């Protein structure tokens, strides 16, 4: 299937208008990102096929790896956010996409006013990151945008992500997931695979895979149900539903399989740039500035052992266990709004 994907994204697709479904539609970006997105080269934006926004908080000076970087849209957006002294590396297997990305490297360096470009692009497979010149425990953040579903060896990808992340780093990525396991007759369809549907993991299989790969507590940031909007493909899919979802997986030792209550709390100082009033860790943890916010042990560690630590006051310790943290459940996690993309633009 790898060759079919290379052909689909290298030869058949020339812009997002060529896609046959709406799987590659972004959420509306926050206001502070819109001026940066407007500065990106038109060709880079036109050849972008992501399904979410992969720009987490607090990126200045960070080292970031983008898996399946394509035309470089996310790489160049993050290039502006990390600043001249940060670094962004893109990995992609498609020559045509890499050519677009590299062709506009000087353009973005000059646009952002940098003396030297802070990005580089490597040709390679995301299942074979060990064959690239990438140092273990080097990256603060690894991102991916609607690419993991295309991989033929997802466990290997997650193992390599774990290896390449610094302690306290995170894998912050958007992808497509299914509400049930995709049957073989759909999984082997090249068009459905290229459209990011056939290779999508059943959501609970993904959670189990993440935990088996060393990411004990995957956190869902945002999600939306995909409305395929292609009658022929909808008829073939039947009752199968797909979702675009953004997860963050922290590379932190000591995270537990469930949310445990140790009587802890945090107070957000309001000091993360662009987030003066509240800090959003995930879709269940929006922490208002100055308010004592009770947290489970895992949330405590995600904040205290990551780049966010200096922006919080931490109350309590792990001395006494009070049982499971209230509200820790295993229901279908995604938003199931039939409104689709809520008017967000396709890209």
PLM ranges: what are they?
Residues 130-141:
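A short acidic, Gly/Pro-enriched loop at the edge of an enzyme's catalytic core
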């Amino acid at each position: 299937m790898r060759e079919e994907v290379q052909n689909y994204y290298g030869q058949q697709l020339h812009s997002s208008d060529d896609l046959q479904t709406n799987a590659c539609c972004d959420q509306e970006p926050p206001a502070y990102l819109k001026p940066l997105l407007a500065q990106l080269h038109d060709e880079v934006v036109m050849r972008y096929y992501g399904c979410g926004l992969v720009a987490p908080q607090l990126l200045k000076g960070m080292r970031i790896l983008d898996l399946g970087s394509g035309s470089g849209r996310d790489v160049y957006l993050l290039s502006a956010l990390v600043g001249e002294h940060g670094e962004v590396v893109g990995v992609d297997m498609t020559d045509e996409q890499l050519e677009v990305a590299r062709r506009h490297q000087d353009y973005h360096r000059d646009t952002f006013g940098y003396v030297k470009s802070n990005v580089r692009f490597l040709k390679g497979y995301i299942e074979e990151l060990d064959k690239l010149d990438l140092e273990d425990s080097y990256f603060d953040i690894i991102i991916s945008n609607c690419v993991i579903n295309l991989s033929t060896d997802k466990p290997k990808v997650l193992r390599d992500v774990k290896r390449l992340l610094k302690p306290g780093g995170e894998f912050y990525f958007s992808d497509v997931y299914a509400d049930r396991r995709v049957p073989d007759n759909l999984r082997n369809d090249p068009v459905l695979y290229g459209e990011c549907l056939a290779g999508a993991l059943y959501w609970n299989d993904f959670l189990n895979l993440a935990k088996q790969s060393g990411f004990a507590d995957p956190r869902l940031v945002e999600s939306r149900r995909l409305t395929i909007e292609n009658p022929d493909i909808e008829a073939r899919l039947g009752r199968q539903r797909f979702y675009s979802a953004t997860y963050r997986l922290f590379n932190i030792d000591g995270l537990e399989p469930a949310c445990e209550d140790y009587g802890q709390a945090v107070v957000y100082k309001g000091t993360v740039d662009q987030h003066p009033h509240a800090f959003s860790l995930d879709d269940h943890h929006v922490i208002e500035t100055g308010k004592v916010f009770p947290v489970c042990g895992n949330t405590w560690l995600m904040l205290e052992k990551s780049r966010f630590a200096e922006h919080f006051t931490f109350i309590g310790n792990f001395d006494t266990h009070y049982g499971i943290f209230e509200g820790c459940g295993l229901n279908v996690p995604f938003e199931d709004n039939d409104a689709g993309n809520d008017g967000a633009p396709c890209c």
